[in-house]
Amino acid sequence: MSSNMQAMKQMRPALVSLTQQQARRRCFKLYRNCIRSIPHLIQHYNLSYNMSEMRNRFRSNFVEFEEVTEKNQLDRLAFIGETELFDAMSLLKTRSHVVNYFDTQPVNAKTISESEKLLNNFFE
């Protein structure tokens, strides 16, 4: 059985985690499923990205939320990620949806221009 089908079979409906560790395990499982689904996404959506670019994009999204520790927030993020991945793997999304996801760069920190720094210092 291919890893794509294996990744599809491991997706489950959203459940409420009993503990924080269980919620974190769900997030790690989602990350593994995202990485396993990359060849399927490239093939079916005819993407021009290589695997390392897509892997880095998935990783940046997970790193963005690594400081979330509350069980309910982890469950919510895992549910959103699972449904998005399920829609993409089930070909419910169009190619433009998937391309837009990989084209947009994650916002890390707001860059402050010199004029904004001056105004911030002035009003402090």
Swiss-Prot record:
It is a peripheral membrane protein. Keywords: Electron transport, Membrane, Mitochondrion, Mitochondrion inner membrane, Respiratory chain, Transport. It is found in: Mitochondrion inner membrane. InterPro entries: NADH_Ub_cplx-1_asu_su-6. One of its GO terms (cellular component) is mitochondrion. Belongs to the complex I LYR family. Accessory subunit of the mitochondrial membrane respiratory chain NADH dehydrogenase (Complex I), that is believed to be not involved in catalysis. Complex I functions in the transfer of electrons from NADH to the respiratory chain. The immediate electron acceptor for the enzyme is believed to be ubiquinone. This is NADH dehydrogenase [ubiquinone] 1 alpha subcomplex subunit 6. It comes from Dictyostelium discoideum (Social amoeba).
